[in-house]
Amino acid sequence: MTHPNIDLVMKLYGAFMTGDDETIGSALSPDITWHSSGTDPTAGDHHGIPAVLAYLGADDHMDDYSLDVVDMLASDTRVAIIAKASGRRGDARFTNEFVQVVELRDGVVTEVWNYNWDQAGLADFMSVPI
């Protein structure tokens, strides 16, 4: 049996992979803040559901996108995810390992922190014209 917070995060990852913004939006607090480390064009703090959905939509501009969850650890208020994402933009291909910490309250996501392993490589990759 998995922790209910892991179930919620896995549901969100599935919705992200299928582009289901309705499911994603329904699981986010209206005052969510999503922190993305680094210097790539999508880095920074994204406040509110519309801004978070726009941030997540940046990955729509990749081909052959995949997301592999390595492990998840959960408590009653947080889920920590170790994962690897890869994709292609034009002729450029990139694989990014990252840690994500998701904070939950009352069954919705209130805050997220992304920590990318290769921030410089991600910045170069996300700057490739599409």
Regions found by a protein language model. Give the residues of each.
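Residues at secondary-structure transition points
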Residues: H3, A43-H47, R93
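Hydrophobic pocket/interface hotspot
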Residues: V9-L12, T23-L28, I32, G48, ...
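A beta-strand edge to alpha-helix "cap/lid" segment located at domain peripheries
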Residues: M1, L53-I130
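Short, low-complexity N-terminal intrinsically disordered segments enriched in polar/charged residues
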Residues: M1-P30, V128-I130
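A short, structure-level motif marking secondary-structure boundaries and short turns
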Residues: N5-I6, P41, K84
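Short, flexible active-site loop motifs that bind/organize anionic cofactors or intermediates
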Residues: K11-G14, T42, M62, V112
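A solvent-exposed, acidic/Ser-Thr-rich amphipathic alpha-helical stretch
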Residues: E22-T23, S29-T77
